[in-house]
A protein has these predicted regions:
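N-terminal cationic and glycine-rich segments that engage phosphates or anionic surfaces
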Residues: 34, 87-432, 436-442, 461, ...
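Conserved helicase ATPase core of P-loop NTP-dependent helicases/translocases
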Residues: 478-500
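Short amphipathic alpha-helical segment within the helicase RecA-like ATPase core
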Residues: 69-77, 97-99, 459-463
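Conserved strand-helix element at the start of the C-terminal RecA-like helicase core
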Residues: 57-69, 86, 280, 440-462
Length: 674
């Protein structure tokens, strides 16, 4: 099936030429191209046109979940008749296994999986395995992390057709082999139930039920049912059912893996004994033997991913399988905001390796744990054949890859100009900023304020709130789903001002924002580099009244570069507007949820309400006040402690996170007694 682009717009401005150049480059076989597109020029629409022209399965890589969700929603709008999928980390919370030698503290792995994102990941892989050509996967950096072997997954696809002669129990065994679980009481996702000659399967990667009706040993009917009403929505003559998990193995592979694990364990024990370190030798012996026993009896163990090399049949050092293995060789890769995403790809391997080094050196894991890892940058390059780097500020790496040939897209179809940039002194900057904010809020416009640190963002937010301005802050400690909701609340007017650090730069589509204020603009560094300033200024480029105020006591080289480049783009847009009689028009974008998965709590209101009349929202289980808490107060306490646990894990403060986790367990026991 071919891609079918649906849009009420036609390419205008620089878009037709950019689409033509990028399409020609792919058809020529160019390995790398750069699309330099300013904010609001329609880069996503251009890429959608290129995808439709070249008709190749496409992986769009974004550097965070928020932007990935935004791209996913836009691509679904452009290609409603094709497969547009979403593949990001399915962890709501993840604390990796770690060992801290300085305090001799071992932290066990702890996690919470988002069931809906797991379903979306499975659906993405299933559609790729189906052989369909019209598949677009929007992914975060998760696509370079290890997953199951494509061979093992393909071997567990269940193909059925009407009139097929197959014993019902044989089909049930196949379902179990594909990791579907029998549950005759509750038909949850990834489960099946049996009632007489009818087998109902809750498909792991869909929100539908597959009903198979037998007549003796013959499949008489294959139906699709709504998972709520159980009304029939479709009938099939044949059907392919894909596995319920991305990690598959067989009994034969498991037995072989255990033998290899045993051999490597003997070698590692001998290694530690040769060093005269009996404690580490005993530790690795006990841990691995326990894991092997669990695998034999239950088929899994805690941390089984550290043995993935044995189950996949890989050699030491051999790269893991990942999402890229499921794409055909000639797929198209689009790297959005490449100046940020490319360095992120390169940094994943080093961080993973550093954490596992302690686990291996101190006898907690076999050296095979190193092979459960993300791809290295070189491995990533070997697996990608044609890449389009998309950025308003491409870095030197991307420019070198395309040998300096850049496709520019500087004209906005709406006629909107790049924002005016004004430099103001830091003296009385807060009072000046307050005055500017009041002017914008009177016009029902929004303001972004960028600071250098998270603490400054929180304090600025608190200051503005105390002066009656509806304000929120956003930084790396705010969870992914909460971040999306906060941005929606900014757009719908719940907040007038959003204060942030680095998350207000790339790709955020906020047409209501007319002012971007950059505090400490002259503090040269990563957050105030030429590229960072240009990206930050671009957040005001979607509004007809867009303006940027840089608060600084002198103009740095980075500031000057940003001012000059912005002026060049303004001039080009003005000339285009005059030549075509265009009057700049305000972008109007419908308010809608980017992704509605999961039952995530609402974005925390960052205006902290007084809690003087309430009991504390965080308490330790040993505190006598816990006994006087109501059930509702305990639930609130658990929720807040969970938030603190997640924040500690993100900061790599594993000891603190583990303490919070233990308190949550105790508080939950108290809750059960209420």
């Amino acid at each position: 099936m071919n891609f079918h682009l649906t849009s009420k717009y036609k390419p205008t401005g620089d878009q037709p030429e950019a689409i033509r150049q990028l399409t020609d480059g792919i058809e020529r076989g160019d390995r790398a191209q750069v699309l330099l597109g300013v904010t609001g020029s329609g880069k996503t629409y251009t890429i959608a046109n290129v995808i439709a022209n070249v008709n190749k399965p496409t992986l769009i890589l974004s550097h965070n979940k928020t932007l990935a969700a935004q791209l996913y929603e836009e691509m679904r709008g452009f290609f409603p008749d094709n497969c547009v999928e979403y593949y990001v980390s399915y962890y709501d919370y993840y604390q990796p296994e770690a060992y801290l030698p300085t305090t001799d503290t071992y932290i066990e792995k702890d996690l919470a999986i988002n069931d809906e994102i797991d379903r979306l990941r499975l659906r993405a892989v299933s559609n790729l395995m189906s052989g369909r050509n019209d598949v677009i996967v929007v992914s975060s950096i998760s696509c370079i992390y290890g997953m199951g072997s494509p061979v093992a997954l393909n071997e567990n696809i269940i193909e059925i057709h009407r009139g097929q002669i197959i014993d019902r129990n044989a089909l049930l065994r196949k379902l179990v082999g594909a990791l579907y679980v029998r549950n005759d009481i509750e038909l949850k996702r990834g489960c099946f139930r049996v009632k007489g000659d009818t087998v109902d399967i809750s498909i792991a990667y869909s929100d539908t039920i597959l009903r198979i009706i037998f007549w003796d040993d013959e499949i008489d009917s294959i139906e699709e049912l709504d998972d709520v009403t159980f009304l029939r929505t479709a009938q099939f003559d044949e059907y392919k059912l894909y596995p319920a998990n991305l990690f598959m193995t067989t009994e034969e592979q498991t037995n072989l893996a255990i033998r290899h694990i045993q051999n490597d364990l003997v070698k590692q024990i001998a290694f530690f004994e040769e060093l005269g370190d009996g404690v580490k030798a005993q530790r690795i012996k006990e841990r691995v033997e326990y894991d092997m026993e669990m695998i034999k009896e239950l088929g899994h163990c805690s941390g089984i991913e550290n043995y993935s090399r044995y189950f996949d049949g890989r050699q030491a050092g051999e790269r893991p399988y990942c999402l890229l293995d499921f794409f055909p060789k000639d797929f198209l890769m689009v790297i959005d905001e490449s100046h940020v995403t490319v360095p992120q790809i390169g940094g994943m391997y080093g961080g993973d390796r550093a954490r596992k080094t302690n686990l291996v050196e101190y006898g907690f894991r076999l050296p095979a744990a190193f092979d459960n890892r993300p791809l290295t940058f070189d491995e990533f390059k070997q697996m990608t054949h044609q890449i389009i780097y998309v950025s308003a500020t491409p870095a030197d790496y991307e420019l070198n890859e395309c040998e300096g040939v850049v496709v520019e897209q500087l004209i906005r179809p709406t006629g909107l100009l790049d924002p005016e940039i004004e430099v103001r002194p830091t003296e009385n900057q807060i009072d000046d900023l307050m005055e500017q904010i009041v002017q914008r809020t009177e016009r029902k416009e929004r303001v972004l304020v960028t600071t250098l640190t998270k603490r400054m963002a929180e304090e600025m937010s608190e200051y503005l709130l105390n002066h009656g301005i509806q304000t929120a802050y956003i930084h790396s400690d705010v969870t992914t789903l909460d971040r999306i909701k906060i941005l929606e609340k900014l757009r719908n007017g719940t907040f007038d001002v959003l204060v942030g650090v680095n998350l207000l730069r790339e790709g955020l589509d906020l047409p209501e924002v007319s002012l971007v204020a950059i505090l400490d603009a002259d503090k040269e560094g990563f957050l105030r580099s030429h590229r960072s300033l240009t990206q930050t200024a671009g957040r005001a480029a979607r509004n007809v009244n867009g303006k940027v105020i840089m608060y600084a006591d002198h103009i740095t080289a980075s500031m000057q570069l940003t001012i000059d480049e912005t002026q060049r783009r303004r001039t080009k847009q003005l000339q285009y507007n005059e030549a075509h009689g265009i009057t700049p028009t305000q972008i109007k974008k419908a308010l809608k949820n980017s992704l509605s998965y999961g039952d995530s709590s609402d974005a925390r209101e960052l205006q902290r309400e007084s809690t003087a009349k309430d009991l504390p929202t965080v308490a330790f289980a040993a505190d006598p006040i816990v006994e006087r808490m109501t059930r509702q107060q305990l639930e609130k306490c658990i929720e807040e402690t969970t938030r603190l646990m997640k924040e500690s894990a993100k900061k790599l403060d594993f000891m603190q996170a583990a303490q919070y986790r233990d308190e949550i367990i105790k508080l939950q026991k108290e809750l059960e007694l209420k």
